[in-house]
């Protein structure tokens, strides 16, 4: 198979294989994209919840990033689980070192079973320093509420929350609407020039573990191949569907 591009994935490992680094690698590979990884934490989990989180020392996360990218230059970066301020600071340092412009942030905060995966201090640092470094942020509804303080009950609230996120410096926002209990799912892409609503039918399935990881990596893969962010979001959503 011909490799279309290369991406670096900075995220946690999921022992069940459905989410995290494992889902990221599978997604990139299916789309013909070469995936490098920097593991931020090892999680013991399954589709029902997280049993434990074993953090990787921040310096070793930094070393994974710098050592791999000195040899293989990524076209884009996808960032997932960053559980502490020390980890975020090391990732910020590595981003400054690499100066890569195409960066997608999936702000993983709460596991499907309800386990919290990030400290409150790390959330504040993400808002203050990391969001302004990325091209696109892809929160689900609970994550968007945590980041903005906005209670989201409808599409208009999603758009308002997206504009609140842009106040932290990120230029493009994709808020995922899958947590609404509606028959149709609305994902909303927002930047200063436009608002695009992607609407799809909800599938009657319990196999939703890792859909956020899969989507953000699919978007990163398409973006790394030269597609625009809006088109990458459209193609990524279609891929997950």
What are these regions (language model features)?
Residues 2-9, 23, 28-112, 116:
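Conserved N-terminal subdomain of the carbohydrate kinase-like
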Residues 31-36, 196, 222-236:
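Phosphate-handling active-site elements
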Residues 22, 27, 146, 205-229:
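Short, small-residue alpha-helix embedded
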Residues 10-16, 195-209:
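Short pre-catalytic strand/loop immediately N-terminal to key active-site residues, enriched for Gly-Thr
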